């Protein structure tokens, strides 16, 4: 295999791993939001959510999403830097 073909294959594999990692991270995020926000905001589940429960879940979800975006952006930047150094 030539160096250029090897490099192309390597980049394709890295790209696929990143996509799968992002998908797994999104699933984990949704699980954590469900576990933490719902548990914290809805102490006694009923047939519907009260306005305060809806507000709490919304704010909690937004907080988790913002934190995840910061972590994900930092992670991707680091991966890109490492790819550039190779």
Curated annotation (Swiss-Prot):
Membrane protein topology class: Peripheral membrane protein
Pfam families reported in the protein's UniProt record: zf-Tim10_DDP
Cystine residue pairs: 37-60, 41-56
InterPro entries from the UniProt entry: Tim10-like, Tim10-like_dom_sf
Motif Twin CX3C motif per UniProt: ranges: 37-60
Cell location: Mitochondrion inner membrane
Gene3D superfamilies given in the database record: Mitochondrial import inner membrane translocase subunit tim13 like domains
Keyword vocabulary terms for this entry: Chaperone, Disulfide bond, Membrane, Metal-binding, Mitochondrion, Mitochondrion inner membrane, Protein transport, Translocation, Transport, Zinc
Annotated Gene Ontology cellular component terms: mitochondrial inner membrane; mitochondrial intermembrane space protein transporter complex
A single GO molecular function term of this UniProt record: protein transporter activity
Gene Ontology terms describing biological process: protein insertion into mitochondrial inner membrane
Record keyword NADP present: no
Domain notes: The twin CX3C motif contains 4 conserved Cys residues that form 2 disulfide bonds in the mitochondrial intermembrane space. However, during the transit of tim13 from cytoplasm into mitochondrion, the Cys residues probably coordinate zinc, thereby preventing folding and allowing its transfer across mitochondrial outer membrane.
Function: Mitochondrial intermembrane chaperone that participates in the import and insertion of some multi-pass transmembrane proteins into the mitochondrial inner membrane. Also required for the transfer of beta-barrel precursors from the TOM complex to the sorting and assembly machinery (SAM complex) of the outer membrane. Acts as a chaperone-like protein that protects the hydrophobic precursors from aggregation and guide them through the mitochondrial intermembrane space.
Family named by the database record: Belongs to the small Tim family.
Quaternary assembly: Heterohexamer; composed of 3 copies of tim8 and 3 copies of tim13, named soluble 70 kDa complex. Associates with the TIM22 complex, whose core is composed of tim22 and tim54. Interacts with the transmembrane regions of multi-pass transmembrane proteins in transit.
Name of the protein in question: Mitochondrial import inner membrane translocase subunit tim13
Organism the protein comes from: Neurospora crassa (strain ATCC 24698 / 74-OR23-1A / CBS 708.71 / DSM 1257 / FGSC 987)
